[in-house]
């Protein structure tokens, strides 16, 4: 079997299928060909890995994988993260979720000669990326809120031109015009939407 340079001359490889509360591990001895499936609870996961001694770990790239990769690399392990779409190609049964098969697919994908791994970010790099993601989410939420306000006010004949600039320029006037709405509950709801809009603007800064 042809394997990539990362997996060559490595005696032990651990493929880990992560979940919220438990971890499925496939421990493979490359010299003997022996494979062992182990499932451990989250609280015992780190200790179980450390007991194996420094080796090669394959993990599917997910929300927590960057953290695990940095942690185990700090203990002398080599960690390689694999994009989920690449692993999926090696699943024997894609319709039925099975942790052991998932771990097997991670291992099989990890040793392929053409597998491209996901770069492990430093904590600082990950923080910057997350802040960027949060800012994008705030922009999306702000646009959604402004469209909602526009839609509600249009029901009462209050119209503003499209675009953030136009909305921001007219926002005070729009708010004052919304005061013309007689229903107190609806008026309060619109007021809260304006407040939410301003909060989203602050989050974008």
Cite the ranges covered by each PLM segment:
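Conserved DEDDh/DEDDy metal-dependent 3′-5′ exonuclease domain
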Residues: 49-90
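Glycine-rich, often acidic, oxyanion-interacting loops/wings at catalytic, nucleic-acid
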Residues: 136-205
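Gly/Thr-rich phosphate-binding beta-strand-loop-beta motif of the actin/hexokinase/Hsp70
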Residues: 7-28, 106
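Short alpha-helix plus adjacent loop in nuclease-associated cores
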Residues: 80-119, 171-176
